[in-house]
C-alpha cells in the first residue's frame, strides 16, 4: 500500500508553476549519516540556476514547506523488555566471529556482512494466547544497538509440511506501512473482525510455506528507533542482518528454499534487498525467487500509464472526465523530463521535485475524485488509506494483551507512519530507478511481477509496460511471449480463469482479474493458487527448458 497524501499536499506547488527544465543539482552522499531532511534545508542555500528556481517555486506556493521537510517527529515511546523475557538472543558479533575452512583449504567467515552491531531477540508465541493460528510462531526484534534501531517480526510456520516447505518474507509498502497489515488484511492466517476477534483465513499463504512478516523500516508498526531510515538501500542492510541471524538460530528453516514477496513500494525494496543478499558469497539465506505485487519499480515507464488506467483503457470504466484526462496528458512531458533527470543523477535535488510534481499532476486528478486509488471500482472509505478494516487491525494490535503476547515494546501501533513516507519522499527515494537491479536478479533466479487489474496506484498497465521494456539478455523472448489464460488447476474451481500470464525464462508477468492493489484481499483463492504454483517452480527457466 502506498501513502500519497504528503506528496499530493505539496505537489500543487510545482504543478502550478511555469514549465522549467530541471537541471542536475548537488548530489547527496548516501553514506553520510546526517538526517536527509535536514541536509536538504542546510544545502538549499547553495543551489544555483534553474534548480533554485524550481525550489523557490515550491516555497513561494507552499510557504511552510521547509518546515514540513525539516520537521523531526519525536521518537516512539517504548518500554524495553528484559532479556529474561526472550527465549533466545542471537548475537551478531558472535556469528561474525565464526570462521570455517572452505573446499580450497582457505578460511573464511561463515557468513558475510557487518553483523557485530546486531542482535536478534526471539519469543516463542503461544498459539493459544491469540488464536491467530495453531502453528508454531516466533516474534521479536532485530536490534541494531549502534544505531538504536529495532525491527519487529512475526513468523508463522507452514500449516502443511514445515520441515520441507519453503520460507517466505512478506513486505508491505508505503513507504512506512506495517507488514502486519498484510498479515491481517490480506494473506496471513487470520483477519480481524469489527469486534476485534480473529477470523481464520483458509487462503493464508502459510498453507504451504512458512511466512515472516516484517515491520520495516524502523518506526513502522511495532518497530522503533531514536533515529530513522529514509532510503531503501539503508533498509536493505537491516533486512539482510535479520534474515542471517534468524536462520542462524533456526537452521531447520535455513535449509529450505527462501523467497521474498511484497507489494506496492516493495517494488523498490525487493530488488535492493535481494541484491544485498546475493552480494554476500558466504550466506545462510537460500534465496530462490522474488515476487513483486502491484509494485512501483520503474516510474519512468509506469507513470505514462496512469492516464489510460484512470480514463477507461485498463479494462474498467473511466473514473475521470475528458478534461481531467487531458490535463494528465498535458502534464506528462514535464513529468517525464523530471523523472529522466532523477534517473540521470539519482540525487534528492532532482528526484524530490519529480516526485512532488508527478504525483500531483499525474496521480492528483484521480486522488481528488474521492475514488479508491487501490481499486477503481469503489469509493475511498476509512481515511486516506480507504479501508475501514485498517482501523480494526490497529485497535487489535494496540491491545495490551496482544502486545504482551508478542513482546511488542512500543506504546502504540499504527498501520502506516506518514513521517516515514515523508522521509523517503524528501530523500528522493520515490522516483529512483530500482528496476536497474532486476536484470542481475533474473540471471540468478525467477522473478515474478503480479498485478491486480483493478488497482490504479500501481496498475497492471504500468507493470506490464516496464516488464516488457526491461533491457536484459532475455528481453526479446519475453517481449515476444504471448499472454495466456491463467486458470485454477487443482481444486473445486478447476478450470476457472483467474487472469493472464506471460513468461519467458526466469521472468514472469501476471494480470489477476478482479484484484485491486492488494490481490490476496480481493481474490484470495486466485492469490493462493498462483503462489503455490510459483513456489513449486512452475514458471522458471528450469521448468521451461
From Swiss-Prot:
Localization recorded for this chain is: Vacuole
The species this protein belongs to is Blastomyces gilchristii (strain SLH14081)
Q: Which residues are glycosylated?
A: 208, 485, 491, 506
What processes in GO biological process is this protein linked to?
A: proteolysis
State the Pfam families in the record: Peptidase_S10
- Which family does this protein fall into? Belongs to the peptidase S10 family.
Predominant location category: other
Q: List the disulfide bonds.
A: 177-416, 311-325, 335-358, 342-351, 380-386
* Keywords recorded for this protein, A-Z: Carboxypeptidase, Disulfide bond, Glycoprotein, Hydrolase, Protease, Signal, Vacuole, Zymogen
Which residues constitute the signal peptide according to the record?
A: 1-17
What this chain does, per the entry, is described as: Vacuolar carboxypeptidase involved in degradation of small peptides. Digests preferentially peptides containing an aliphatic or hydrophobic residue in P1' position, as well as methionine, leucine or phenylalanine in P1 position of ester substrate.
- Known catalytic reactions: Release of a C-terminal amino acid with broad specificity
Q: Which GO terms describe its molecular function?
A: serine-type carboxypeptidase activity
Q: What Enzyme Commission number(s) does the record list for this chain?
A: 3.4.16.5
Name under which the protein is recorded: Carboxypeptidase Y homolog A
- InterPro entries annotated for this entry? AB_hydrolase_fold, Peptidase_S10, Ser_caboxypep_ser_AS
Q: Per the record's keyword annotation, is Lipoprotein included, yes or no?
A: no
One GO cellular component term, please give it.
fungal-type vacuole
What are the catalytic residues? Answer: 264, 455, 517
Pro-sequence residue ranges: 18-123
Amino acid at each position: 500500500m502506498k501513502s500519497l497524501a504528503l506528496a499530493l499536499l505539496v505537489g500543487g506547488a510545482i504543478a502550478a508553476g511555469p514549465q522549467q527544465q530541471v537541471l542536475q543539482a548537488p548530489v547527496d552522499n548516501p553514506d553520510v549519516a546526517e538526517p536527509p531532511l535536514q541536509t536538504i534545508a542546510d544545502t538549499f542555500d547553495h543551489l544555483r540556476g534553474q534548480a533554485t528556481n524550481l525550489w523557490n517555486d515550491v516555497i513561494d506556493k507552499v510557504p511552510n514547506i521547509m518546515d514540513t521537510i525539516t520537521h523531526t517527529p519525536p521518537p516512539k515511546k517504548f518500554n524495553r523488555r528484559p532479556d529474561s523475557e526472550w527465549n533466545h538472543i542471537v548475537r551478531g558479533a558472535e556469528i561474525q566471529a565464526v570462521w570455517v575452512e572452505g573446499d580450497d583449504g582457505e578460511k573464511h567467515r561463515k557468513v558475510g556482512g557487518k553483523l557485530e552491531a546486531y542482535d536478534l531477540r526471539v519469543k516463542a508465541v503461544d498459539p493459544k494466547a491469540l488464536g491467530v493460528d495453531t502453528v508454531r510462531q516466533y516474534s521479536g526484534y532485530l536490534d541494531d544497538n549502534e544505531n538504536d534501531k529495532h525491527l519487529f517480526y512475526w513468523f508463522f510456520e507452514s500449516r502443511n509440511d514445515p520441515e520441507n516447505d519453503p520460507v517466505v518474507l512478506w513486505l508491505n509498502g508505503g513507504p512506512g506501512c506495517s507488514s502486519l497489515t498484510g498479515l491481517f488484511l490480506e494473506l496471513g492466517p487470520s483477519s480481524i473482525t469489527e469486534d476485534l476477534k480473529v477470523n481464520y483465513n483458509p487462503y493464508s499463504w502459510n498453507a504451504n510455506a512458512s511466512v515472516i512478516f516484517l515491520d520495516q523500516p524502523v518506526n513502522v508498526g511495532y518497530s522503533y528507533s531514536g533515529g530513522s531510515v529514509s532510503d531503501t538501500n539503508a533498509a536493505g542492510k537491516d533486512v539482510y542482518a535479520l534474515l542471517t541471524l534468524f536462520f542462524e538460530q533456526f537452521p531447520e528453516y535455513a535449509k529450505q528454499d527462501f523467497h521474498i514477496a511484497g507489494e506496492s513500494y516493495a517494488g523498490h525494496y525487493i530488488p535492493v534487498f535481494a541484491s544485498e543478499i546475493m552480494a554476500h558469497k558466504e550466506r545462510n539465506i537460500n534465496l530462490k525467487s522474488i515476487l513483486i505485487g502491484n509494485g512501483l519499480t520503474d516510474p519512468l515507464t509506469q507513470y505514462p500509464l496512469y492516464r489510460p488506467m484512470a480514463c477507461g483503457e485498463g479494462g474498467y470504466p473511466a473514473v475521470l472526465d475528458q478534461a481531467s484526462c487531458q490535463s494528465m496528458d498535458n502534464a506528462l512531458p514535464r513529468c517525464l523530463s523530471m523523472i529522466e533527470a532523477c534517473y540521470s543523477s539519482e540525487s534528492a535535488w532532482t528526484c524530490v521535485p519529480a516526485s512532488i510534481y508527478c504525483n500531483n499532476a499525474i496521480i492528483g486528478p484521480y486522488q481528488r475524485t474521492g475514488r479508491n486509488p487501490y481499486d477503481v471500482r469503489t469509493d475511498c472509505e476509512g481515511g486516506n488509506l480507504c479501508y475501514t478494516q485498517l482501523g480494526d487491525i490497529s485497535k487489535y494490535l494496540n491491545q495490551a494483551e496482544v502486545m504482551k503476547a508478542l513482546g511488542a515494546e512500543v506504546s502504540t501501533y499504527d498501520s502506516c507512519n506518514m513521517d516515514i513516507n515523508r522521509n523517503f519522499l524528501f530523500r528522493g527515494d520515490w522516483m529512483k530507478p530500482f528496476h536497474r537491479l532486476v536484470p542481475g536478479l533474473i540471471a540468478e533466479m525467477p522473478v515474478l511481477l503480479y498485478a491486480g487489474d483493478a488497482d490504479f496506484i500501481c496498475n497492471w498497465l504500468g507493470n506490464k509496460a516496464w516488464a516488457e521494456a526491461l533491457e536484459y539478455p532475455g528481453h526479446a523472448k519475453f517481449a515476444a511471449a504471448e499472454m495466456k489464460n491463467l486458470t485454477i488447476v487443482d481444486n473445486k474451481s478447476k478450470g476457472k480463469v483467474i487472469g493472464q500470464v506471460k513468461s519467458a525464462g526466469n521472468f514472469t508477468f501476471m494480470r489477476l482479474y478482479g484484484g485491486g492493489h492488494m490481490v490476496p484481499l480481493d481474490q484470495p483463492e486466485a492469490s493462493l493458487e498462483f503462489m503455490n504454483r510459483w513456489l513449486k517452480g512452475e514458471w522458471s527457466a528450469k521448468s521451461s527448458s
